[in-house]
Amino acid sequence: MIASLRGKLLQLEIDRLVVEVSGVGYEVMIPFPLHLECKDKLNTEIYIHTFHSITDRGQRLFGFGSKKDRESFELIKSLHGIGELTALKILSFFQADDLYQIAKADDKKTLEKIPKVKGKTSEKILFEIKQNLKKFEMFLNEGTTESSFVDRETDLATLALIQLGFDEKSATKQVADAKKLNPGLSASDIVKQVITGTR
């Protein structure tokens, strides 16, 4: 099993990267936070933790910036009805400690900031997290607070716009402009303002 990779970053996209190790290029699926970490590291050496998936449909590598993120991914994908790609999508928006706080507060609205996670889908995910709350509690840090995920509103809004069809440069600028005018905006409010053209 491939648990980690160290090598030159050859290619970087929103949801994947290619890292060259000893002359071999490995394509790795990644969450959005790792994409942000790697933005300025093309053609330089990187180190990532990986989860090596082997199924009847083939093999895939998933990459993470920390061991904790990889363990969060493994926990999320172990929930009933949640596959690897859905788990990666969730991890692009929220870490395991965020999900713990969301479930404790029964905050379906926050969970629905993830594109296409609405209605019965968000209810099912929330239910599964609640059923495994003790496991998610293990990811809490001493500094974790009820509003810890609020600090990532900018990243949430940027990713949401990209998934709506904006290119990354435009999405980043639009979000920065909106936050400059009103620093207290939530991710969903930023996205609404950008789409409607209001400020």
Curated annotation (Swiss-Prot):
Any GO MF annotation of the entry: four-way junction helicase activity
Disulfide bonds: none
Biological process terms in GO annotation: DNA recombination; DNA repair
Entries under Pfam families matching the protein: HHH_5, RuvA_N
TM stretches of this protein: none
Region (Domain III) location: 155-199
GO terms for cellular component: cytoplasm; Holliday junction helicase complex; Holliday junction resolvase complex
The keyword DNA repair belongs to this UniProt entry's keyword annotation: yes
Domains as described in the record: Has three domains with a flexible linker between the domains II and III and assumes an 'L' shape. Domain III is highly mobile and contacts RuvB.
Entry function: The RuvA-RuvB-RuvC complex processes Holliday junction (HJ) DNA during genetic recombination and DNA repair, while the RuvA-RuvB complex plays an important role in the rescue of blocked DNA replication forks via replication fork reversal (RFR). RuvA specifically binds to HJ cruciform DNA, conferring on it an open structure. The RuvB hexamer acts as an ATP-dependent pump, pulling dsDNA into and through the RuvAB complex. HJ branch migration allows RuvC to scan DNA until it finds its consensus sequence, where it cleaves and resolves the cruciform DNA.
The protein's assembly and partners: Homotetramer. Forms an RuvA(8)-RuvB(12)-Holliday junction (HJ) complex. HJ DNA is sandwiched between 2 RuvA tetramers; dsDNA enters through RuvA and exits via RuvB. An RuvB hexamer assembles on each DNA strand where it exits the tetramer. Each RuvB hexamer is contacted by two RuvA subunits (via domain III) on 2 adjacent RuvB subunits; this complex drives branch migration. In the full resolvosome a probable DNA-RuvA(4)-RuvB(12)-RuvC(2) complex forms which resolves the HJ.
Name used for this protein in its record: Holliday junction branch migration complex subunit RuvA
Annotated organism of origin: Leptospira biflexa serovar Patoc (strain Patoc 1 / ATCC 23582 / Paris)
